[in-house]
From Swiss-Prot:
Active site per UniProt: 176, 248
UniProt entry keywords in alphabetical sequence: Cell cycle, Cell division, Cell shape, Cell wall biogenesis/degradation, Cytoplasm, Glycosidase, Hydrolase, Peptidoglycan synthesis
Organism annotation: Yersinia pseudotuberculosis serotype O:1b (strain IP 31758)
Name the record gives this protein: Beta-hexosaminidase
NCBIfam families: PRK05337.1
Major site of localization recorded for this protein: cytoplasm
UniProt pathway: Cell wall biogenesis; peptidoglycan recycling
Enzyme Commission number, as recorded: 3.2.1.52
Catalysed reactions listed for this entry: Hydrolysis of terminal non-reducing N-acetyl-D-hexosamine residues in N-acetyl-beta-D-hexosaminides
Length: 343
């Protein structure tokens, strides 16, 4: 299995995509909204992906909830992470967060999708890229809700990906459009943003981590996603993380400072990433495959899902029906709340 995760253009594979998926450097594929028409079509697309590749790829999606939910029609409307903090009763909030993690994972695994890149562990809501994707502005409250969501995912059989290390929540710039700089003292990042990663790693709850395309100016001139300081010295050595490290999408503007697509990919792998994402630019992805040093990433097989869910059986279950009703209601209340704030 190779270290590159790619995307595909539409509802089904074309001939070029079938050939690309056979490349020895390809180890994963991420799906987007453009790949989804309905549940039956999605399941068939995943089947095509499995059939086209020599090895079982890690199939992924961003199905966080709120504004980042790639598959909507026919799937539960998942609430934004921040909405759980608006529930007055802490026990109810914790239970619902756990059910959200379970339900999201179960619905994805019924499509034979291995992972959703979740949860978001960024602290605070000022970032344009993060906002309501963050559970809370208080690190301990965020950790409590994230841990519940994670336990739900794990109970269903899906591995977790904490993002965006060491924390994207304090920068207003959107790394999809530019390279954000976080100029805060390193001590503040460590005690405010990084503590949630530290605690969840200590509890063995994170299977993978995705670093941020953010430059933390007191630490390194490179974004964390291409920084050996953050990925090896801090994440591996200091925090003792033994799971998978993903780059964020290298087509994002936040990664452009690292050079061409091939240079971005090599820099991220050299810095300590196990798998790199190259999406939304076919030419860039092919350039990475043509120029990357040969490398195996067999540790990625740890991310295969272990849940066995039939979609019809799942949706007929009382647990799914109760969770679906409660989570849909929370989503609607949260949207109404945002409207009163003019958001």
């Amino acid at each position: 299995m190779g270290p590159v995760m790619l995307d595909v253009a539409s509802y089904e594979l074309d001939a070029e995509e079938r050939e690309i998926l056979k490349h020895p450097l390809v180890g994963g594929l991420i799906l987007f909204s453009r790949n989804f028409h309905d549940a039956e079509q999605l399941r068939e697309l995943v089947r095509q992906i499995r059939a086209a590749s020599h090895e079982r790829l890690v199939v992924a999606v961003d199905q966080e909830g709120g504004r980042v939910q790639r598959f909507r029609d026919g799937f539960t409307r998942l609430p934004a992470a921040q909405s759980f903090a608006a529930i007055n009763d802490a026990a109810t909030a914790a239970q619902l967060a756990q059910e959200a993690g379970w339900l999201m994972a179960a619905e994805m695994m019924a499509m034979d999708i291995d992972i959703s890149f979740a949860p978001v562990l960024d602290i605070g809501h000022v970032s344009a890229a993060i906002g309501e994707r963050s559970f809370h502005s208080d690190p301990q409250q965020a950790r409590i809700m994230a841990e519940c969501f994670i336990r739900g995912m794990h109970s269903a059989g899906m591995k977790t990906t904490g993002k965006h290390f060491p924390g994207h929540g304090a920068v207003t710039a959107d790394s999809h459009k530019e390279t954000p700089h976080d100029n805060r003292p390193l001590a503040e990042i460590r005690t405010h943003d990084m503590v949630i990663f530290r605690e969840l790693i200590q509890r063995k709850l994170l299977d993978a981590i995705m670093p941020a395309h953010v430059i933390y100016t007191e630490a390194d001139a490179r974004p964390a996603s291409g920084s050996a300081y953050w990925l090896q010295e801090i994440l591996r050595q200091e925090l003792g993380f033994e799971g998978i490290i993903f780059s964020d999408d290298l087509s994002m503007e936040g990664a452009a400072i690292m050079g061409s697509y091939a240079e971005r990919g090599q820099a991220s792998l050299d810095a300590g990433c196990d798998m790199i994402l190259v999406c939304n630019n076919r030419q860039g992805a092919v350039s990475v495959l043509d120029n990357l040093s040969p490398i195996k990433a067999d540790q990625l097989t740890r991310l295969y899902h272990s849940g066995q869910f039939d979609r019809q059986t799942l949706m007929a279950s009382s647990r799914w029906q109760q969770a679906n009703k409660a989570l849909t209601a929370l989503s609607e209340r949260w949207d109404a709340h945002k409207q009163t704030l003019g958001q």
